[in-house]
From Swiss-Prot:
It is found in: Cytoplasm. Belongs to the SmpB family. One of its GO terms (cellular component) is cytosol. It comes from Corynebacterium efficiens (strain DSM 44549 / YS-314 / AJ 12310 / JCM 11189 / NBRC 100395). InterPro entries: SmpB (IPR023620), SsrA-bd_prot (IPR000037), SsrA-bd_prot_CS (IPR020081). PROSITE patterns: SSRP. The keyword Zinc does not apply. This is SsrA-binding protein. Signal peptide: none annotated. GO terms for biological process: trans-translation. The keyword Cytoplasm applies. It holds the Pfam family SmpB. GO terms for molecular function: RNA binding.
Length: 164
């Protein structure tokens, strides 16, 4: 009897990640926020087309807004299609917004989207409180990662040498 293929859960999947944010910023804390979207935006996201590269969040009048999230127009859409880089509202609890306002106002910090994903059919955004890294910090991180990689590689070689 043939094996059954595992069904991909379309209601719980990662739609886009912002890998550059973890490289350019030190992430101090994260929050999960809902995103207010139009119907054609949801359909376009389900096609796997989104970019968080230049996106950032701003707190304005006690509301959190996401700028520069690029969701291309829906391929099967008509005149009802959305604008690809429109400003989108993020849904957070009032005390979370107040906490964010205090932390961003302290200075030298910004709100950066890290991941866009589906939870039970609803689009959620992982929002990070970020502080910019200097060039030497980035170089130190790269050096540390390469050293860790070399150590694990050497351990693997030694284990294979003993067991083989």
């Amino acid at each position: 009897m043939a094996k059954k293929k595992k069904k991909v859960d379309e209601n719980n999947q990662v739609l886009a990640t912002n890998r550059k944010a973890r490289h350019d910023y030190q992430i101090l804390d994260t929050w999960e926020a809902g995103v207010v979207l139009l119907g054609t935006e949801i359909k376009s996201l389900r096609e796997g087309k989104a970019s968080l590269v230049d996106a950032f969040a701003v707190i304005d009048n006690g509301e959190v807004w996401l700028h520069n999230l690029h969701i291309p127009t829906y391929s099967m859409g008509s005149w009802t299609n959305h604008s690809p880089k429109r400003t989108r509202k993020l849904l957070l609890h009032r005390r979370e917004i107040d906490s964010l306002m205090g932390k961003v106002r302290d200075g030298n910090r910004t709100l950066v989207p890290l991941k866009l994903y589906l939870v039970n059919g609803r689009v959620k955004l992982e929002l990070g409180l970020a502080q910019g890294k200097q060039d030497y910090d980035k170089r130190q991180d790269i050096k540390r990662r390469t050293e860790e990689r070399e150590v694990t590689r050497e351990l693997g070689r030694r284990i294979k040498g003993i067991n083989a």
